[in-house]
């Protein structure tokens, strides 16, 4: 049998297909780019191209179903009871899915069972708990571009957080994409920019990016006449993006969105700018392999609630510049740290659950019974949290948290009365509403569960009333409930008995009372289920009325959770409160790398960092593995921790205003873009030199190493000089070009430091201690020996090093700056006569050897 290889959904004429396939194809035509899960009995089936794609992605069997239009139909399916597992996998792969349910009764349908689309699941609009990562915001992002400006709108539908901003460069745009890491990204079909860092990218038609339409949609959503009250009217591109976003969410949700009741502008100047490279290099949310272990978030996240965990990551991803707000956070941490108040608060917070997403599902009317059970538990904890905060000396931050927690006594009592202690997962089969909550429901349940006792009582009652001792009450599927009397006593049957069936030895009757009971019992289960669903919807209505205070409560709990966690981390990890200053300074006493210290078995060597107006750049030298990169990263991480309001891994820290953190650490080929290691390095360096300011912290490691010695040295020298003299940024500049240490003699704001090491019996011992002044040796052979280079190779290298060091030695230990880049005009022998064999480093010797070879070749 030949499988149809092309989906017929693009054809207008479906007449050649079976009625059921015509129904499917009409639905599929409305959603050509989405996978359609089409309910058929106990399975969701996929057909044609959808089936082939799903079979590959989900590793399920591709088969065929009969014929339609003369061809076998490719088909794949999944059981309805396991569909959530398959949906989770598809969403994580960036796919979008349409769920098409049977809404008709197969027993009464004359043609195909009626079906309709009940859910559209896309990566950025999913709200089901099973499909979400509880530690990560699930963000939908829209970008609207006009020339070199970009409007950005983001929405986390699982919280209602709706944000917009405008950006004026592609570098800043990509930095935002890296920060937000949207689950789904929408751009116009006319966009020229191609961001590649989102899990799922979709192009939307240009007409969805209409400013006037956006204004109308947003005003309708927020039930306002204008957007003036939101303070966003100066962001027309972002408003247009928000309009497209709202259209898309309305399209996917097919329901009201009452939890989206506000929109906020993100001001770029409020936060430290951290570009994509810096986020990766500092391993803020994930390590360099893309995993969370050994990242800053991994170290800090001891939160008690999922929403606290997500908020902590938002804080890490967006450090603030407002020192007043940061001081408030720090003061709150100090209060929670005192007498270890954080411990008792944590014990209560861990019973809250994911209140933020539960409230969103209530708003979307997709909350499940266990969501309401968890909400009830959370509301029950609030009075204790209130009391715990009341007992503390509250600063402004903690007072706001307490005020926004709220007390929901009525809702708590309602949920206590309405929902059983341990409800089932879904409302579908009932058993959710507690006995005693609703009298009609109780009556229906009693009829269903206690019908046998009713029949016993009725039989006894009728025997006594009629004096017929052979009277029985029975039931069969055909005739239902009946009263049975023997033929011998049938003449004694009361007149109100209505004959229903005559058998050989008995007569069977029905009475009005029994008929009423029969109707009630036979329909009681379905009626009880319908009543239960009705009551459940009424509960959701009641909860939706309290949506805004519940959202405020969830936000307050998340903030309390993060501050509480920072207090616990400060106590456990020996962090101390930094001091904020209004003048330029980064002064860290006994600073430590928080993650390296945590994973090491040996004690970590703390080091000082001192940068100020007269000391803006440190040229850092020392051996590989000596700790240069760790030292630079720890300085950046301590700064970043302070700017999220955390305590820091240092004995003391003073920090002035910081606007940006840049890193140029490590590099690799970008084969996808056709860029070499050196090109990647120079692109990152260029971004720093174009964007750093006097208030920036810049980390640069081994600039220039990806090209020839003299090209690299020249570039490193020029970049360091530019940073120190033109930008005047705070900079840590690690290098193996010893010649760069000469900068300190000509530029007062440049200082030399090195990471110390000692040599013992041809082995190197790294002290990891920062010392003033330049390093006097690179220890390259010793590091190579530690790396496992064969001993014979090391011995050969040592012999070669001695040969290079002996004949070629410079006159001075540190050549003057103006001699570094002069062209060599003397012949080889003249140059040799000018050299002195005592003080050159191995690298200097090798460089001069290459120089002499070049001179010789020119002769």
Swiss-Prot record:
Annotated ATP binding sites: 622-629
Pfam entry (one): MutS_IV
Keywords, in A-Z order: ATP-binding, DNA damage, DNA repair, DNA-binding, Nucleotide-binding
Domain of life: Bacteria
GO CC annotation: cytosol
InterPro entries attached to this UniProt entry: DNA_mismatch_repair_MutS, DNA_mismatch_repair_MutS-lik_N, DNA_mismatch_repair_MutS/MSH, DNA_mismatch_repair_MutS_C, DNA_mismatch_repair_MutS_clamp, DNA_mismatch_repair_MutS_core, DNA_mismatch_repair_MutS_N, DNA_mismatch_repair_MutS_sf
Gene3D superfamilies cross-referenced by the UniProt entry: 1.10.1420.10, 6.10.140.430, DNA repair protein MutS, domain I, MutS, connector domain, P-loop containing nucleotide triphosphate hydrolases
GO MF terms, alphabetically ordered: ATP binding; ATP-dependent DNA damage sensor activity; damaged DNA binding; mismatched DNA binding
CDD domains, per the entry: ABC_MutS1
Any Gene Ontology biological process: mismatch repair
Function, in words: This protein is involved in the repair of mismatches in DNA. It is possible that it carries out the mismatch recognition step. This protein has a weak ATPase activity.
PANTHER family, sorted: DNA MISMATCH REPAIR PROTEIN MSH1, MITOCHONDRIAL, DNA MISMATCH REPAIR PROTEIN MUTS FAMILY MEMBER
Family assignment from sequence similarity: Belongs to the DNA mismatch repair MutS family.
Full protein name: DNA mismatch repair protein MutS
Organism: Coxiella burnetii (strain Dugway 5J108-111)
